[in-house]
C-alpha cells in the first residue's frame, strides 16, 4: 500500500489549521513527526479530542494516522518537512465514523470536493464537509465553498452513518 521514499511539505499558518499527510515517516509519533516545528506548536488535536500539548509534555495522541486529519494551533507560520513512503490513495481507504470525522487527503494533486465525495453523495451519506476556515461543501444544496481538496490539508466531514471513503489515484 506504500511506494518508495518521497517527501511532502505542509505549510501551517499562524493560529488554527487542519493538516494531514500522505507520507509514512520512520517515526509517526506526534512528537517526532512535528519535531522540526516543536517550538511553534501550541496544541494538536485529533477528531476524538485527544491532544498533544508540548508545553505540558503531554501526548494523548500517540502516533499520527494516515487516515486522519489533525487540528493544530501554532504561534507562527511554519512548515512540516517530511520524508518517507507514500500511501497510495486508492489502496488506503478512509474509514468514517457516523457523525463528525477529521479526514486526511491522500492525493498529491488537488481535486474538486464533489468528485472526492461522489460515492458518499450518491449514497446520501454526507451532511457537510468543512475546511480549516469553515468553508463548506453542502451536497444537499449543490454548494461547494471548499473548491478543491488540497494535499497537506485535513477536512471535517459529517456523515449520517459509518462508511468508507475511497480516493482515486493521482492519474
Predicted regions span which residues?
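N-terminal exported-region signature
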Residues: 1-171
Amino acid at each position: 500500500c506504500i511506494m518508495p521514499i518521497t517527501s511532502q511539505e505542509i505549510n501551517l499558518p499562524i493560529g488554527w489549521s487542519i493538516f494531514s499527510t500522505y507520507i509514512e515517516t520512520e517515526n509517526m509519533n506526534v512528537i517526532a513527526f512535528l519535531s522540526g516545528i516543536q517550538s511553534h506548536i501550541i496544541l494538536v488535536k485529533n477528531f476524538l479530542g485527544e491532544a498533544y500539548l508540548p508545553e505540558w509534555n503531554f501526548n494523548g495522541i500517540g502516533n499520527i494516522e494516515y487516515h486522519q486529519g489533525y487540528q493544530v494551533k501554532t504561534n507562527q507560520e511554519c512548515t512540516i518537512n517530511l520524508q518517507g513512503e507514500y500511501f497510495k490513495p486508492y489502496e488506503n481507504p478512509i474509514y468514517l465514523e457516523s457523525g463528525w470525522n477529521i479526514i486526511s487527503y491522500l492525493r498529491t494533486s488537488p481535486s474538486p470536493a464533489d468528485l472526492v465525495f461522489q460515492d458518499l453523495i450518491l449514497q446520501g451519506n454526507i451532511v457537510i464537509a468543512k475546511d480549516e476556515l469553515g468553508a463548506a461543501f453542502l451536497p444537499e444544496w449543490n454548494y461547494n465553498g471548499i473548491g478543491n481538496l488540497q494535499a497537506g490539508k485535513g477536512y471535517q466531514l459529517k456523515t449520517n452513518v459509518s462508511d468508507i471513503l475511497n480516493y482515486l489515484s493521482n492519474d
